[in-house]
């Protein structure tokens, strides 16, 4: 299973990636929105772990782009945002 971890906090990103790699997953990482979109549009992932608070293009923008180009890829949102509106927007 191929995963992409998108998180701007390098320590968090690397810790999540290492745990998943150690569990046997193939893992790519990136730390900003533009780089993430480039990976998403050129590679095939089974799951994307996506932070919402990213520099440049934020996670919601990436999610909208992903849904326009590939409805099949599953996304797990990883964020400190706690607002209900953010959760609902992520489901759309």
Name each model-derived stretch.
Residues 1-92:
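N-terminal/domain-start alpha-helical segments
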């Amino acid at each position: 299973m191929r995963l992409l971890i998108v998180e701007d906090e390098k320590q968090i990103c690397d810790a999540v990636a290492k745990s998943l790699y150690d569990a046997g997953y193939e893992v790519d990482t990136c730390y900003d929105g533009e780089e993430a979109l480039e990976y998403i549009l050129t590679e095939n992932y089974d799951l994307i772990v996506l932070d919402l608070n990213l520099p440049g293009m934020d996670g919601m923008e990436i999610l909208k782009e992903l849904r326009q180009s590939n409805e099949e890829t599953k996304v797990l949102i990883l964020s400190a945002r706690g607002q209900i509106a953010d959760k609902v927007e992520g489901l759309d």
